[in-house]
C-alpha cells in the first residue's frame, strides 16, 4: 500500500517565517559565544570603571583589539545590544553612539558581589559544551549513561574530582549562584527560617549559602555537609560547621534541611533516596527547604519557561537527571514520606518548596 503524501504546502509568508525560525535556533549559539567574548574582553568592567557611557572609539582604546578588526568589534557590540547586554545612547557632543550597562551586564562585573560571571564561564567552557554534540549518539546507544560521559570518558563528578582545577572552577560557579540566591533569600524570605535553631545545608559546597544565613540570623547554627575533598581545609566557626560526608549515607539532624539545586542533579530513584535521608534527619516540627526549578512556575515571566527547559536539558546532558514539574515534585515529596508541602515562586527560574514530615 502506497504511503499517502501529507500536504505541507506553505504560503510564501509561512515558508519564509519557517526559515527565520530555523535560522534563529540554528545560530542561537552566537548569542552565547558573544556573551562569552564580552566577559573575556572585560567589556562590562571597562564600562563600569569608566563610570559613564563610552563611545566605540573609547572602548577600542581600552581593549587590545587588533586594528584590522575594529569594524568587527562594532558588530560584536551591535549583537550584544540586540541581546540586551548593553544599551546604545546618543552622544550629544558628536554623532558617535555610546554604550552603557544594562541590569544583565551588571551581573557580569567580575568584582560585583552578585556576579554570575563564573557560572557563565563554566557553562560555556568546552568541557561542558562538548557533551551537547553527543545528544543523538546518547539517545541511540546504551554505552554511556550520560552525554557528558560520552564526551569526556567519565562522569561529571569524576571529572571534577580527577581534575582539581575543574573542581575549583565549578565550585566558584556554584558559589556565585548561591550568593545571588542567598541575597534574595535573606532579604525577602527570612521568615522561612525564623524560629529555626539548627540548619544543615546538604551539598552546600564551601558554605556560601550557609554563611549568608548565619550572617543574617546569627542565632542559627548551620552545618554544611559535602564530599570530603570539597570541604577539606574549610574552617568552622561558632555557628558554622563543615562535615565531610555522603548525603546518601547520613545527614546530621537539624530543625531544617536545605537542598539548593541538589535534587535536579539526580534521577527520581536517587532523588527519592536523598529526600528520605533528609526527612529522617529533620527533628519533630522541622522541615526540608528545597530551592530548585519547578517547570511551568512563573512561566508568564519573560524568558523563565525557556530557561527552565534549558536547565532541564542541561541536567539530562550532564547527569541523565531532570528538572521537575509540580506534579513530579509532589509525587517525589509524598513518596519520600512527607505529609505536606508549600510552594513559593520565589527566585525567578527557581522556586522555594517547604516540605513537612
From Swiss-Prot:
Which pathway? Aromatic compound metabolism; phenylpropanoid biosynthesis
| Catalytic activity annotation | (E)-isoeugenol + S-adenosyl-L-methionine = (E)-isomethyleugenol + S-adenosyl-L-homocysteine + H(+)
Q: Where is the active site?
A: 264
Q: Name one GO molecular function term.
A: protein dimerization activity
Q: What is its EC number?
A: 2.1.1.146
Return the InterPro entries for the record.
Answer: COMT-like (IPR016461), O_MeTrfase_dom (IPR001077), Plant_O-MeTrfase_dimerisation (IPR012967), SAM-dependent_MTases_sf (IPR029063), WH-like_DNA-bd_sf (IPR036388), WH_DNA-bd_sf (IPR036390)
What's the domain of life for this entry? Eukaryota
- Which positions carry the signal peptide feature in this UniProt record? none
The free-text tissue note of the record is: Specifically expressed in the peltate glandular trichomes on the surface of the young basil leaves.
Any one GO BP annotation for this protein: phenylpropanoid biosynthetic process
Swiss-Prot/TrEMBL keywords? Methyltransferase, S-adenosyl-L-methionine, Transferase
Q: Which residues bind S-adenosyl-L-methionine?
A: 203, 226, 246-247, 260
- Which family is annotated? Belongs to the class I-like SAM-binding methyltransferase superfamily. Cation-independent O-methyltransferase family. COMT subfamily.
Function comment: Phenylpropene O-methyltransferase that catalyzes the methylation of the para-4-hydroxyl of eugenol to methyleugenol. Can also convert chavicol to methylchavicol but with less affinity.
Name by which UniProt lists this protein: Eugenol O-methyltransferase
Q: What is the lineage of its organism?
A: Eukaryota, Viridiplantae, Streptophyta, Embryophyta, Tracheophyta
Amino acid at each position: 500500500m502506497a504511503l499517502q503524501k501529507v500536504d505541507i504546502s506553505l504560503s510564501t509568508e509561512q515558508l519564509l517565517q519557517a526559515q527565520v525560525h530555523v535560522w534563529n535556533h540554528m545560530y542561537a549559539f552566537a548569542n552565547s559565544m558573544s556573551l562569552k567574548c564580552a566577559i573575556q574582553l572585560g567589556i562590562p568592567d571597562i564600562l563600569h570603571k569608566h563610570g559613564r557611557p563610552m563611545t566605540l572609539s573609547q572602548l577600542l582604546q581600552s581593549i587590545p583589539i587588533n586594528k584590522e578588526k575594529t569594524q568587527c568589534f562594532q558588530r560584536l557590540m551591535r549583537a550584544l545590544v540586540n541581546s540586551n547586554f548593553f544599551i546604545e545612547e546618543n552622544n550629544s557632543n558628536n554623532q558617535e553612539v555610546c554604550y552603557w550597562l544594562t541590569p544583565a551586564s551588571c551581573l557580569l562585573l567580575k568584582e560585583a558581589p552578585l556576579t554570575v560571571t563564573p557560572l557563565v564561564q563554566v557553562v560555556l567552557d568546552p568541557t561542558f559544551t562538548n557533551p551537547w554534540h553527543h545528544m543523538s549518539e546518547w539517545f541511540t546507544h546504551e554505552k554511556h549513561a550520560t552525554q557528558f560521559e560520552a564526551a569526556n570518558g567519565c562522569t561529571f563528578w569524576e571529572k571534577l574530582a580527577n581534575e582539581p582545577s575543574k573542581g575549583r572552577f565549578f565550585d566558584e560557579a556554584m558559589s556565585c549562584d548561591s550568593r545571588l540566591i542567598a541575597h534574595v533569600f535573606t532579604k525577602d524570605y527570612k521568615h522561612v527560617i525564623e524560629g529555626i535553631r539548627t540548619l544543615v545545608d546538604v551539598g552546600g559546597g564551601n558554605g556560601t549559602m550557609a554563611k549568608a544565613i548565619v550572617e543574617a540570623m546569627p542565632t542559627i547554627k548551620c552545618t554544611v555537609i559535602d564530599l570530603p575533598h570539597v570541604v577539606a581545609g574549610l574552617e568552622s566557626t561558632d555557628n558554622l560547621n563543615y562535615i565531610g560526608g555522603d548525603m546518601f549515607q547520613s545527614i546530621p539532624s537539624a530543625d531544617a534541611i536545605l537542598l539548593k539545586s541538589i535534587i535536579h542533579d539526580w534521577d527520581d530513584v536517587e532523588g527519592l533516596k536523598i529526600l528520605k535521608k533528609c526527612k529522617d534527619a529533620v527533628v519533630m516540627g522541622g522541615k526540608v527547604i528545597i530551592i530548585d526549578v519547578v517547570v511551568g512556575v512563573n512561566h508568564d515571566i519573560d524568558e523563565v519557561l525557556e530557561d527552565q527547559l534549558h536547565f532541564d536539558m542541561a541536567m539530562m546532558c550532564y547527569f541523565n537527571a531532570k528538572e521537575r514539574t509540580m506534579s513530579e515534585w509532589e509525587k517525589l515529596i509524598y513518596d519520600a514520606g512527607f505529609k505536606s508541602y508549600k510552594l513559593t515562586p520565589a527566585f525567578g527560574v527557581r522556586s522555594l518548596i517547604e516540605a513537612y514530615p
